[in-house]
Each structure stands twice: as structure tokens, then as C-alpha cells.
């Protein structure tokens, strides 16, 4: 979870048991338990997964209660751990992406998360199949109409407070609120109700990376027992619910999940991170009618005053036959102003330099400049989802990132301006689930942004498809 989130929480003395010892099952026992879990998943008709901070530690996000957890170090009077990358650039783990594949295959029916890192949504779990019990650090919601807004920056507040932005739904415009709970905040019905419903219906609840200490969330998995459901707990520490579980696995979550996917002959899909930004060109005619005064702004799609955390700087240049001064925009807001002859047309070139945490250094773009922008407001119809899917496929095929595409064009009459929204691939991760069970802590898998493996056996594909069809039946 976020260090910023922990610092924003109200102070309480009792945060539960911390500094908990970690246990590792012997390799042969671990393998047996992995195979047992795979069989339970294969037989399951309604699988629910319940996740905690332990599934995100491999993403560079510290947990709370482990030997080096945030609250453990706080209680010991030690410095807090430093995140290995900016919170907003954290990428889904192998476990996150394996859950996506299980959901796509129709095996996983619902995910319940205690985390506020938003990685389940970013990985591709559908919102309607996800309960974020404690909120999402990157989500704002409208208390009036219920609209949700997933941001590419961390929302400033926690505790369901008003933020600085308003709902963009027509005829609404209410002030938005953050979604992250403070200690005394009750679990929202929108999140807890479907979580309870699916736990009661589940024949298998798989708990991943959670110490199962925070109430009332920790009691949700137990609701499957009345209907004959089973519980499996995968965690390095012992939990208060271990005695209720059918299987308890002490091992690295990524390692266990990788082994399960291998046993099921299922591939863990790559993760492609796509970020959006807009280039806005605003024009006005000079008083003597001879020149065009224009302003160029590179802005967030979440609002002109919102930060662009994934962009470090922008280099702007012009066609070779024009002597306009180039510019380097290295402070937000990214803004430049120029004056040109009224009838001139030329190309503007952009080199977008990305911030730390992105897998690509920069992207090159160009935008034609014409002195006349239509006075009629309109939005060009572009199949956004088709563009995004094409970018994902290209990134995986080319084993690289930096691909870009236009997902929206719109013209506004007052002030006269044209906005072009770009989608660009800023990160790529591929996951290889090959295991080595010589020792519990040794998992031979690669997490990379510059390469991917598309190889998959025909036998594996047939088994995976058969498993999905059997589950849906």
C-alpha cells in the first residue's frame, strides 16, 4: 500500500498485531499444496478471491504488518521503508494478472480487496466484479449521481472528503469525494453488500496475502462455510482464521499463484499500461487582424489544473522552413504562446519525455497547425476501445512501449480551440511462471518491459479452454 496513505490515516494506538514472523513451507510440501489448490479451483463453480497487501509487495509497495511493514517499523521507532518507484507507477504483480486470466476464463467470479492501490482495476478486473472495501487512492466518486473517476494521480485526501474537482456528468456538477476510508469510516454498502453476497454463494474463497486481522472485512471469507464452501489461505504469516481454512499455504503469493496457473495450463497475460493526455491549441486574431495569437497546452484528461505525473518534460519544434523558436516545457502546466502570420500552415513536433517509473523514455508526435479552426463545436467519433486494443496488441507483439494513437478530437467555439487526446503505451510487463521448488523463496520468473514470450503449447490451450467451458457449464 501507499506510504502516503499510511501517513494520511488518523492516529490510533492499536493497529493490531505487527512484526509477525514469516513461515515458509518446505518445497515438497509447498508443491503438494499448490497442486491441491489447483484441483480445488478446477472443481470450483463460484470462486471468490480475497486479497491483502501481500499481493502488492512484489510491485514495490510495502505491507503493514510484516517484519519490514509500515506499522511494524513505526512501532519500533525506525524509518519507514522507501518505495522503489512512485506510487502512481506501481504495476500489477504476477498474481494480479493471473486473477485477470482466471476471470476472463469464467473461473473467477468476484474479487474482494482490502488494498487501496487500485491495481486490480488497472490490471483488468471489471469494476462490477470487484469490491474495494477500503477504497482506492486513485478513485474519486460523485456523492450525488454515483459516477466514478479513475485517475492517473493519487487523490490528495482520504476519509471520504471533498476534493478540488467536480462531477463532469451533464446536469450534475457536484463536488467529488475521495473513496479511501479512515479508521472510523464504515465500509460502504456499495462495496460490502456484493462482497457478502458472493462470499455466501462461494464454494471456494481464496485468501491471498492478508493477515485477516482488520474487522469486519476479515470475517467475509467465513460466510462461505455455512453453504459448504471451502477456504484456502496463502500468506507468509499465520492468521486468526487458519483453523477455519481447509488449506493454509505459507509461501510467496506470486510463487504459489504461478504454480497454480502452471498446473491449470493457463498463461499469465502481459500488462500494458496506457496513459492519456491532451494537446489543446487555442487561437485568437490580433487586434489589427494580421496575426494569429495561439496558445499550446499539454494537459491532463482529468482537467486543466490536474497534474500529469507520468510526463517529465516536452520538447516543441516546428517545420524546417519556419523560424519559430523551439521550446522545452519542463514545468507544469506545460504551456507556450506564439504569434504567427494569419495564413500560415505548418507542423508542430512534440517529443514527450516520460517520468521515472515509465518503461519508455519518450514518444514523438506531430500536429498540423492551420490558422482556421471551425467555429462549430463538434467531437470526432473515434472507436476508443479499438484504438486502445490495437496499442496493447502492438506493444506485446513488438515487446516494447511508446506506441501512440488518437482517441478523441474535439472543437470548442469559445474560446476557439481544438483538442486532441492521445493514448500512449508507457509501460509493459510480461510474466513467466516457470517454477523452481528447490527452495520456497526461489521463484524463477521474469518481470520485464522489453520482451515477452508468446509461446504456448497447443495442449495447454486445449486444457485451458476445456476448463473454462466446464466452469461456465
Swiss-Prot record:
Residues 27-267 form the Deacetylase sirtuin-type domain. The keyword Chaperone does not apply. It is found in: Nucleus. GO terms for biological process: ethylene-activated signaling pathway. Keywords: Ethylene signaling pathway, Metal-binding, NAD, Nucleus, Transferase, Zinc. Zn(2+) binds at residues 142, 145, 167, 172. Its EC number is 2.3.1.286. Signal peptide: none annotated. Pfam families: SIR2. GO terms for cellular component: nucleus. Gene3D superfamilies: 2.20.28.200, TPP-binding domain. Residues 453-465 have a biased composition (Basic residues). Residues 447-473 are annotated as: Disordered. GO terms for molecular function: chromatin DNA binding; metal ion binding; NAD+ binding; NAD-dependent protein lysine deacetylase activity. SUPFAM superfamilies: DHS-like NAD/FAD-binding domain. Disruption phenotype: Reduced ethylene sensitivity in the double mutant srt1 srt2. It catalyses: N(6)-acetyl-L-lysyl-[protein] + NAD(+) + H2O = 2''-O-acetyl-ADP-D-ribose + nicotinamide + L-lysyl-[protein]. Its cofactor is Zn(2+). The keyword Nucleus applies. Binds 1 zinc ion per subunit. NAD(+) binds at residues 52-71, 114-117, 209-211, 235-237, 253. Belongs to the sirtuin family. Class IV subfamily. Binds to the promoter region of genes influenced by ethylene. Interacts with ENAP1; this interaction is enhanced in the presence of ethylene. This is NAD-dependent protein deacetylase SRT1.
Amino acid at each position: 500500500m501507499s506510504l502516503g496513505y499510511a501517513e494520511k490515516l488518523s492516529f490510533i494506538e492499536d493497529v493490531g498485531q505487527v512484526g509477525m514472523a514469516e513461515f515458509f513451507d518446505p518445497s515438497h510440501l509447498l508443491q503438494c499444496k499448490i497442486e491441491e489448490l489447483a484441483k480445488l479451483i478446477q472443481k470450483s463453480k463460484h470462486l471468490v478471491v480475497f486479497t491483502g497487501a501481500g499481493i502488492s509487495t512484489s510491485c514495490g509497495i510495502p505491507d503493514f504488518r510484516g517484519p519490514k511493514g509500515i506499522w511494524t517499523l513505526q512501532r519500533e521507532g525506525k524509518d519507514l521503508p522507501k518505495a522503489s518507484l512512485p506510487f502512481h507507477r506501481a504495476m500489477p504483480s504476477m498474481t494480479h494478472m493471473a486473477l485477470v486470466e482466471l476471470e476472463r476464463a469464467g473461473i473467477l467470479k468476484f474479487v474482494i480487496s482490502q488494498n487501496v492501490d487500485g491495481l486490480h482495476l488497472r490490471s483488468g478486473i471489471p469494476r462490477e466484479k470487484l469490491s474495494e472495501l477500503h477504497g482506492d487512492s486513485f478513485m474519486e466518486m460523485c456523492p450525488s449521481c454515483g459516477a466514478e473517476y479513475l485517475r492517473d494521480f493519487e487523490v490528495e485526501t482520504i476519509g471520504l472528503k471533498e476534493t478540488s474537482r467536480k462531477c463532469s456528468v451533464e446536469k450534475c456538477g457536484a463536488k467529488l469525494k475521495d473513496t479511501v476510508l479512515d479508521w472510523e469510516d464504515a465500509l460502504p454498502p456499495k462495496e460490502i453488500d456484493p462482497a457478502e453476497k458472493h462470499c455466501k454463494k462461494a464454494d471456494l474463497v481464496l485468501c491471498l496475502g492478508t493477515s485477516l486481522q482488520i474487522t469486519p472485512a476479515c470475517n467475509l471469507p467465513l460466510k462461505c462455510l455455512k453453504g459448504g464452501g471451502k477456504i484456502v489461505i496463502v500468506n507468509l504469516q499465520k492468521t486468526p482464521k487458519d483453523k477455519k481454512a481447509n488449506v493454509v499455504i505459507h509461501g510467496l503469493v506470486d510463487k504459489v499463484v504461478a504454480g497454480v496457473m502452471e498446473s491449470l495450463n493457463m498463461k499469465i497475460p502481459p500488462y500494458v499500461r496506457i496513459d492519456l493526455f491532451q494537446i489543446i491549441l487555442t487561437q485568437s486574431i490580433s487586434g489589427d487582424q494580421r496575426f494569429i495569437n495561439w496558445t499550446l497546452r499539454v494537459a491532463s484528461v482529468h482537467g486543466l489544473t490536474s497534474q500529469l505525473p507520468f510526463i517529465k518534460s516536452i520538447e516543441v519544434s516546428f517545420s524546417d522552413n519556419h523560424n519559430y523558436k523551439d521550446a522545452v516545457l519542463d514545468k507544469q502546466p506545460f504551456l507556450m504562446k506564439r504569434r504567427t502570420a494569419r495564413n500560415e500552415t505548418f507542423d508542430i513536433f512534440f517529443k514527450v519525455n516520460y517520468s521515472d517509473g515509465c518503461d519508455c523514455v519518450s514518444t514523438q508526435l506531430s500536429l498540423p497547425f492551420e490558422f482556421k479552426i471551425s467555429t462549430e463545436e463538434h467531437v470526432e467519433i473515434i472507436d476508443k476501445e479499438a484504438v486502445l486494443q490495437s496499442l496493447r496488441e502492438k506493444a506485446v507483439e513488438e515487446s516494447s512501449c511508446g506506441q501512440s494513437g488518437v482517441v478523441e478530437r474535439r472543437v470548442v467555439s469559445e474560446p476557439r480551440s481544438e483538442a486532441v487526446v492521445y493514448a500512449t503505451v508507457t509501460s509493459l510487463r510480461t510474466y513467466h511462471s516457470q517454477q523452481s521448488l528447490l527452495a520456497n523463496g526461489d521463484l524463477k520468473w521474469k518481470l520485464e518491459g522489453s520482451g515477452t514470450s508468446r509461446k504456448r503449447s497447443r495442449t495447454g490451450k486445449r486444457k485451458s479452454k476445456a476448463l473454462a467451458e466446464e466452469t461456465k457449464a
